[in-house]
Amino acid sequence: MATFGEALEALEEFRAELVNLQMNATVPQAQAMAFRATAGQAGDTPLANVHATGVGIRDDGQFVVKVYMFDAASVQSAASVSLFSAPMQGVNVDVEHLPVQVAFDRGTARKAAAAAAGNPAQHQARRRPVPGGVEIGPLGGNFVGTLGCFVRRGGDDNGPLFVLSNNHVLANVNRFPAGTPFTQPFSASAADTIATLSSFEPILFPAPGSQPRNVIDAAIAVVTDPAQVVTGRMLNIKKYTPQLMAPRPGMTVTKAGRTTGVTNGMIRAIRVRGVQVNYGTRQNPIIATFDNAITITGNGGLPFSNPGDSGSVILDKASGRPVALLFAGDGSTTTACDVSVACARFNVHPV
């Protein structure tokens, strides 16, 4: 059985061979790596449908190279490509269906019945003092997300307190200016304001001659009145330890989110390169590509997240330490970014 390190080495070799195959295939590489919005897939062959790869884990604890395809039908025909059917440096290769992910920023509580055990109503209510894992939205706006956790600047325990969440929650996908007020819960009343937008990492989208990659969907907002919030706490999570931790395939995780409340799941893969995320609508998709992503599935066949849970900080369940920042999904798989990378971007640490 391969070790985690061996799986990482095999992943890099696999990616190199995949690029060579795609360049030499009859389907042009540009088409193979692009999302064809009208069809919901990149092409008509297994090679053309690969859009992401990472290192993951099977239920038996075996580390594997993960290959993600747009089209479920192509997963069935993947065995026709030797690269997908044979081990890479002794590490098995698993091919799975992963559709285009959707940025989870709208507050429609879909599948609420399935998530009722997570007490979602408590996470949508007004809370004072405000903990992590609750509803947040722009003052008088038309969407909501989740307040992930509170953070401070590195080494400054007496400095300003910030909210950590997603760009598409706090900055409305690069649109909001600094100083935009946010309320808890979503409200049209300025009296419910708890923070104002401070900074965000821009989300990059394709343009003629440019195919940029993203690694985080993250932003911070400065807390307006620290007396109105409580640090070191996630609503309905018993163990929260505000110390960053590296994610790992097979890790049991938990999160508190605005729509599904507290849910539990498992990290299926990390260092996933090439995940396609839709920041538009189904009819008018606006696709951004993410590298170094993390994929998670919920326990017991339940969704780990739903729209409105974006911005949730995902914790290692055993230690309560933050490992990821939730930002997208498809109803079955949740996609997150490494929260350590997000914190480093803003020079902050959880508190």
Segments predicted by a language model, with ranges:
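Protease-domain processing segments flanking chymotrypsin-fold serine proteases, especially trypsin-like
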Residues: 2, 6-162, 175-210
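Surface-exposed flexible segments
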Residues: 75-88, 232-244, 337-344
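Serine endopeptidase catalytic core focused on the charge-relay Asp
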Residues: 115-293, 297-298, 307, 315-321, ...
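C-terminal, disordered and strongly charge-biased linear tails with low hydrophobicity
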Residues: 147, 336-351
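Peptidoglycan cell-wall recognition and remodeling modules
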Residues: 325-326, 350
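A short acidic/small-residue loop/turn micro-motif
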Residues: 330-331
